[in-house]
C-alpha cells in the first residue's frame, strides 16, 4: 500500500511515479524495557532502536529498516538497500547521505548493486543551520513521523512491528496529501513541491 500511494502522490505532483534519486538517514529512539532487542547508541547516548529510512525527493517514504541502536549507519544502510531489493524501484540509482555514511564497506556494496552514493556536506566556511538539498528532505520526514506517538518511543517486541508502525504513519501522511486535506506538521509534504530547491 505504501508503494502504491507514493506512486500516486508523485503522479499528482507531476513527477514520474518511480524516483531516480533517494535520500537516506537514520534516527535513534528510546525503546521500552518491555520491548524486544535493543542496543546502545554511543553518539546519541540512547538505549533503544535505530530507524533507517529512504525517502524520495518529495520526502515520501520508500523503505524503512529497523535495527538495534548499536548498529552503525553504514551497516544499517546496507540492510536498508538489501530490503529495498524486494521493491520495484527501476529508476532509483543515486542516494544522498551525510558524512556518517562515508565508509568503504558501504561504497563497495553499492558499487556491486549499481547504486551511487552522494555524500552531502556543508559548504566550507558555513555557520549556523544550512539546509542541504535533498538531505533536508529526509530530516523533515523524520519530523513528520515523530508527530505520531508510536514512533516517538518503541514499545514493539519485534523489528518488523516497529517497521509496520512507520509504514502506517507514512500511509496516513500520503492519504492526507492525496485527498487534499488540510496539511498539518505531520502531513504537509505538499509544500516541498512548491520549493524549487528541493525539486528533482
Tell what function each PLM region has:
Residues 1-200:
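Short alpha-helical elements
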Amino acid at each position: 500500500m505504501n508503494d502504491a500511494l507514493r506512486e500516486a502522490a508523485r503522479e499528482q505532483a507531476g513527477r514520474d511515479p518511480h524516483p531516480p534519486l533517494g535520500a537516506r538517514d537514520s534516527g535513534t529512539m528510546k525503546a521500552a524495557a518491555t520491548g524486544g532487542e535493543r542496543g546502545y547508541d554511543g553518539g546519541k547516548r540512547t538505549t533503544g532502536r535505530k530507524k533507517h529510512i529512504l525517502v524520495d525527493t518529495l520526502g515520501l517514504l520508500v523503505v524503512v529498516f529497523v535495527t538495534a541502536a548499536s548498529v552503525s549507519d553504514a551497516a544499517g544502510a546496507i540492510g536498508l538497500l538489501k530490503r529495498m531489493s524486494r521493491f520495484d524501484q527501476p529508476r532509483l540509482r543515486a542516494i544522498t547521505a551525510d558524512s556518517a555514511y562515508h565508509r568503504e564497506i558501504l561504497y563497495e556494496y553499492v558499487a556491486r548493486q549499481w547504486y551511487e552514493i552522494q555524500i552531502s556536506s556543508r559548504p566550507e566556511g558555513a555557520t549556523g543551520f544550512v539546509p542541504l538539498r535533498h538531505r533536508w528532505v529526509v530530516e523533515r520526514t523524520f519530523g513528520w513521523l515523530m508527530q505520531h506517538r508510536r514512533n516517538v518511543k518503541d514499545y514493539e517486541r519485534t523489528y518488523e512491528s516497529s517497521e509496520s508502525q512507520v509504514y502506517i504513519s507514512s500511509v496516513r501522511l500520503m492519504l492526507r496529501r492525496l485527498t487534499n486535506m488540510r496539511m498539518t506538521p505531520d502531513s504537509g509534504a505538499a509544500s516541498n513541491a512548491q520549493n524549487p530547491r528541493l525539486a528533482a
